[in-house]
Regions:
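Cytoplasmic helix-loop-helix junction between adjacent transmembrane helices
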Residues: 103-140
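Juxtamembrane intracellular "pre-TM" segments in multi-pass secondary transporters
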Residues: 1-6, 182-210
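Intracellular juxtamembrane helix-capping segments at the cytosolic ends
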Residues: 112-124, 308-321
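Helix-to-loop junctions at the C-terminal end of transmembrane segments
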Residues: 62-72, 254-266, 352
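Conserved MFS/SLC helix-loop-helix module at the cytosolic interface between two early adjacent transmembrane helices
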Residues: 59-95
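C-terminal transmembrane helical hairpin of 12-TM major facilitator-type secondary transporters
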Residues: 268-313
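Structural signature of the two symmetry-related core transmembrane helices
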Residues: 75-89, 168, 269-283
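C-terminal membrane-cytosol helix-exit motif in multi-pass small-molecule transporters
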Residues: 168-187, 374-378
Length: 388
């Protein structure tokens, strides 16, 4: 059972994480459609706009995590939220693709995810830590689902500027919530460990690889999906909320049973999830321009398996860390996550520019199958084997 202090801490952190991830995810289902109308826009620059957030976030996660270990979580999280706010403001007022890229880069530079996860771990006992991580995992899944409904609705009436104004409001609310949080002391004022030791730790490294590939595929895929829906199947952006909500609701058929069984056999669940994800992308490549029904089924299975992997990987990682280096470890993990976002946007934008939608769908199918084969050959998924 949570203590009253733990309940307050978990609630505040969960809300901040939800608002931040909602703001990050809302652009995914619509950016590749609306950014096409910006001055000097090209398919590659659209992909870069989507992915540059991940690059700057990946670069800044480790410094922010290190600083949060040294100066305290609250102070560093507030700095990150302020930087994110500035980037959102630039995105809201521009109609030039290059300034949009700059704004997105600043959004990513406010890299607080690792520090937030470390603060959550600091604020809960060992017995309650897994449950608190699961609560945050649910909030991330809810943010992901909500973003694919709210994003298209807001962009329908206000286009991208209105979307970024809403993100600004969410960020201001997050700052207010963090200001109400009890100040956290520094956990480590002596840097007596090596960053590279944490990066290459054999217990932690599989988690980093998993999240990198997972988000590379996700970002590439969502460069293609909005364009596929509008250009191939002539589905209006106005219909996106109904489309995405149907996909996410039906994906729970996959997600909920797997998450329920995850406590008993996490390794098996991760393997099953990755197999489902790989085959859904193979079918997407095969039928992306010929059969909307099969594409919808494939997306349902993809989102369901993605949600299981997205929740399971950080939960496993948290069991392998200690308090003194937790901020840095979670930030390294988040760096790989967002570097995957950058790679997905960069590679997806290039493939879309050079080969069209088929290039993106082929890439996501191939990389997911390679990931599956590597994991099966090593007999691990997300390093859960290591912790057995």
């Amino acid at each position: 059972m949570f203590t009253s202090v733990e309940k307050k801490s978990v609630t505040l952190i969960t809300l901040i994480y939800f608002f931040r991830m909602l703001g990050a995810f809302m652009v995914f289902p619509v950016l590749s459609v609306f950014a096409d109308s910006y001055n000097m826009s090209t398919p590659f620059l659209i992909g870069l706009t989507l992915g540059i957030y991940g690059l700057t976030n990946a670069i800044m996660q480790i410094p922010f995590g290190l600083l949060s270990d040294y100066f305290g979580r609250k102070n560093i999280i507030l700095v990150g939220l302020t930087i994110f706010l500035l980037g959102s403001f630039i995105c809201a007022i521009t109609d030039n693709i290059y300034y949009l890229i700059i704004g997105r880069a600043l959004q990513g530079a406010g890299a607080i995810s690792g520090a937030l996860m470390a603060l959550l771990s600091d604020s809960t006992s060992e017995n309650n830590r897994t449950l608190s991580m699961a609560i945050v995992g649910v909030s991330i899944g809810t943010a992901f689902f909500s973003a694919f409904i709210i994003g298209p609705v807001l962009s329908k009436y206000f286009e991208l500027p209105g979307l970024f104004i809403f993100i600004i409001l969410l960020t201001v609310l997050s700052i207010i919530l963090m200001l109400s949080f009890k100040n956290t002391p520094a956990k480590n004022t002596q840097f007596n460990f090596s960053v590279m030791d944490l990066v290459f730790d054999k217990r932690l490294k599989p988690h980093y690889i998993d999240i990198l590939v997972l988000h590379t595929v996700l970002t590439s895929l969502f460069i293609a999906i909005p364009v596929m829906m509008t250009d191939v199947y002539l589905i209006s952006v106005n219909e996106f909320p109904q489309l995405y909500s149907s996909i996410f609701i039906l994906s729970l058929i996959i997600t909920l049973p797997l998450l329920r069984y995850d406590r008993k056999n996490p390794v098996l669940v991760k393997n099953i999830s990755l197999i489902i994800l790989s085959f859904s992308l193979i079918f997407s490549f095969q039928f992306y321009n010929t059969n909307l029904f099969i594409i919808m089924i494939a997306l349902i299975f993809y989102i369901g398996s993605f949600s299981v992997l997205e929740a399971g990987i950080p939960s496993s990682l948290s069991k392998q860390t200690n308090q003194e280096t937790r901020g840095l470890t979670m930030s390294i993990y988040t760096s790989f996550q967002f570097f995957g976002t950058f790679l997905g946007g960069f590679i997806g934008g290039y493939l879309y520019d050079a080969y069209g939608l088929s290039g993106i769908f082929f890439f996501t199918a191939v990389i997911s199958v390679m990931w599956l084969l590597i994991c099966l050959s090593r007999n691990f998924i997300g390093a859960d084997i290591v912790s057995k």
